[in-house]
Amino acid sequence: MSNVFDSKSFLKTVTSQPGVYRMYDAGGTVIYVGKAKDLKKRLSSYFRGNLGSRKTEALVALIEQIDVTVTHTETEALLLEHNYIKLYQPRYNVLLRDDKSYPYIFLSADHHPRLASHRGAKHAKGEYFGPFPNGYAVRETLSLLQKIFPVRQCENSVYRNRSRPCLQYQIGRCLGPCVEGLVTEEEYARQIDYVRLFLSGKDDQVLNQLVARMEQASGDLRFEEAGRLRDQIQAVRRVTEKQFVSNQGDDMDVIGVSFDSGMACLHVLFIRQGKVLGSRSYFPKVPGGTELAEVVQTFVGQFYLQGSQARTLPSDILIDFTLPEKDLLAASLTALSGRRVSIQSKPRGDRARYLKLARTNAATALITRLAQHSTIHQRLAALAQTLKLPAIGRMECFDISHTMGEQTVASCVVFDANGPLRSEYRRYNISGITPGDDYAAMNQVLRRRYGKAIEESKIPDVIVIDGGKGQLAQAKEVFAQLDVTWDKSHPLLLGVAKGTDRKAGLETLFLEPEGEGFSLPPDSPALHVIQHIRDDSHNHAITGHRNKRAKVKNTSALETIEGIGPKRRQMLLKYMGGLQPLINASKEEIARVPGISTALAEKIFYALKH
């Protein structure tokens, strides 16, 4: 127990109402957030003789201050608790690290609606179908829809400026509503209705309508149309036969749980209108000594009560665990969504099959993750031994990418004890240096990265510099000149030079810019982790460089034209649908762009043609 914190005096001031409490350590950092129906009773339990777990003992020993927020109801306390957990990320709370919004399929409200992938706030007018577990599931579904229902998926800027149909029309994946006369308004609207029904899980209605139209066309001797409808019917049937579908048209999430070796996996199946849209495995950060009940309870709360997750609430949640506060959580979700949300742990029939499937997936994913962590732990231990370090808890690696000195981008990749920490990967646009000067680029990125205050937990044990002696010398110089409050002598700087023919396994490692380096055997686990972080850093840098180069390529031709500033440049590209359509456009078409006069259109036309 803390020698500074006076628990007796503090408890005299605490009310017995519901609310949320935040515990701070000596540095003023929030280390735990909790909620209580009775704050006084709950907080008193932390300062009794027998705390019941090592985790709680360790937590209480660090307490220097406790802040309390009183709420009207326990439901309010639950919502506030999860908002605070998201805000402060306390070390003693179970943390859901993946907090990305989910993608949807968007059907626009345009005159000729389009299909698209959407993620984020739902500002655009139209219909949203989902959520899907990831972007891949959305792309696969859009590709499938395009083959069955040839509805446009192009941006409005492209659609509005076409005078002839694109390749999608030529290969039968779009009806070509952009060009007058290719498809009737009635037929396009009918295909949109089919898409809407299909995404709503009403496959039978789609098939019934298609069959009726096919029979009508056949009876009227319109055999070519009947043949197209037959092919469309077969495509829909092939898709629906492959799906594991619930007869009830359920709208639910199914959560399977697996827990082993201090690691938890919660696998979520997303089911909408009876169809499995996909699934995703989650591995929340679990403090040592945490009970499974707390892990599951906290995960479910964070998953549905934090941020964007609240917009994706299903009608039912099936979970492979009896939650201690199931009724409270269900009441909170019901209040949040404005409709009844139920939580079930012992379903029957098809729902029991779904739960078994989620449980199996959770167990399989956990076995895979444990094996991966075992491998990365072994590799980091081997590298620590090679570098004569007690342990390696965090590594960072830097690489530079450019083309002939242009669009230079530096990348920083982060590994922790469990491998790649992708949420902390960063790219830096490098400017103000001589083109092609990799040393100056490395010098700049290291100063930007480390020339500021850094949390103690984020100071790397090893910094890998891709480039060998010269780049390592730059890193040593930067660190010698840093004027910072954190211990700049802590990170070990390691240079990595590729072999003469740049083959993996022939790398030379340098701890100092002078003298000979050393090599590790090709089968060395220590070398493997260096190769892993080096390759990730290279890929991250080159991807950023290519994106930057493509952006410049699309605007550089316009930048040379007098009278075309950033706003007009953006308007031209957006209205015409990109640089190539603009290059192919006539003077009259360019003059239709808002803000572009006939004289300026002529100037643009000749500048792009010559």
Swiss-Prot record:
InterPro entries: GIY-YIG_endonuc, GIY-YIG_endonuc_sf, GIY-YIG_UvrC_Cho, Hlx-hairpin-Hlx_DNA-bd_motif, RuvA_2-like, UVR_dom, UVR_dom_sf, UvrABC_protein_C. It holds the Pfam family UvrC_RNaseH. The keyword Amino-acid biosynthesis does not apply. GO terms for cellular component: cytoplasm; excinuclease repair complex. GO terms for molecular function: DNA binding; excinuclease ABC activity. One of its GO terms (biological process) is nucleotide-excision repair. Residues 204-239 form the UVR domain. Its main location: cytoplasm. Residues 16-94 form the GIY-YIG domain. Keywords: Cytoplasm, DNA damage, DNA excision, DNA repair, Excision nuclease, SOS response. It comes from the Bacteria. It is found in: Cytoplasm. Belongs to the UvrC family. The UvrABC repair system catalyzes the recognition and processing of DNA lesions. UvrC both incises the 5' and 3' sides of the lesion. The N-terminal half is responsible for the 3' incision and the C-terminal half is responsible for the 5' incision. Interacts with UvrB in an incision complex. PANTHER family: UVRABC SYSTEM PROTEIN C (PTHR30562:SF1), UVRC/OXIDOREDUCTASE (PTHR30562). This is UvrABC system protein C. It comes from Erwinia tasmaniensis (strain DSM 17950 / CFBP 7177 / CIP 109463 / NCPPB 4357 / Et1/99). The gene is uvrC.
